[in-house]
Amino acid sequence: MLFRSSAHAELPSELTLRWSRRIGAGDDKRHQIAAAPVAQDGQIYTIDSHSMVTALDETGTILWQRELGKSTDALKDASGGGLAVHGTQLFVTTGFGTVVALDTSSGAWLWTQDLASYGGASPTVYENLLYIAARDGAAWAIDTSNGRIKWQVAGPTVAASHTGGPGPAVSDKYAVFPFGSGDVLASFRKGGLRSWNSGLSGARLRLASTQVRDLTGQPVIEGSSVYLASSVGRMAAVDLNTGLRIWTAKHGSQGHILLAGRAVFAVSDTSNLIRLSKDDGTLIWSTPLPKFTKKSLKLRAKIHAHFGPILAGERLILASSDGLIRQFNPSDGTLLSTVELPAGAASAPIVVNGTLYVLNTRGDLLAFR
């Protein structure tokens, strides 16, 4: 079976590292790279762990850089950030609670909006509005031309959430906002009037990580349904117009979910690459992934992060913090091949014009062809 979807991209079966370019600061004890690169018209945009934005061309040449950090004190305490590109504007959210619009060709500062809220979640652009769900439980629609707030809605209070965070999903009628509490809110996208809200409750017993009940991936809208996943063992399909549950599966997600054909793919919260039926949430297959960074039972405090999956070249691709790109058969989950990374992955990969780009924990953008 061939998998074709809007997420599908062409990519050679054999991947070789073509170039590597330092784009700023990598991960450290206080800061993490929290956003995948974005691309448009032959340019790739990144944000490092200290809110440095970089634009590069497809040869790895740095075109411009812009430091968005407010101050030394802000950089000490804030991490995360998100990117979205549309037309001649690059939109950036920061961990300091600001949203910035930059000119894509020069990096010139166009406008800034201070949301006075914990930011860092990825923004979503639809027509002339920028939609943001802050990590502390608020949501905004911002005019892309001048940065003015068009409307705002208050979401649930959030005690704890993951760094960065997913962006809203937007259709012609609705904006669907994910929050760190595990709740989702749908508003009419033009005026902000609430339509419905829902939550993904769940638990993984004896796991401290389940104290953070975050929606870990961007909601995915397809037709009249929206697909959601949490960090605590729940995935669901919901009617976009009513918020009523279509199905629920006892599988969470570490990050974004991927829809392709009649399938839903994700890296589960228990570190398995899984495929579910999009129709009813039935588990089709599950492939175990490396989980703990230490083999000793006493040292199992940290787990490997697996970013993705994406679908390219008719195969599923993950980039992982253990320093490997893994490629899988989407039909049965078989591991097809691995490619070594210089240092662990820090973001989901993207594919542009037959090249795979991924950030590593050192702050390097890597290009594979």
Regions inferred by a protein language model and the residue ranges of each:
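Short loop/turn segments that connect beta-strands within beta-propeller blades
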Residues: D57-T61, D103-G107, D143-G147, F188-G192, ...
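Structural signature of WD-repeat beta-propellers
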Residues: D48, D57, A78, T94-G95, ...
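Loop/turn-rich, solvent-exposed surfaces of beta-rich toroidal or solenoidal domains
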Residues: A263-K278, T282, S286-Q327
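Blade-level signature of beta-propeller repeat domains, shared across WD40, Kelch, NHL, RCC1
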Residues: L341-R369
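Extracytoplasmic beta-rich repeat domains
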Residues: W19-V38, Q65-A84, W109-Y126, I149-D172, ...
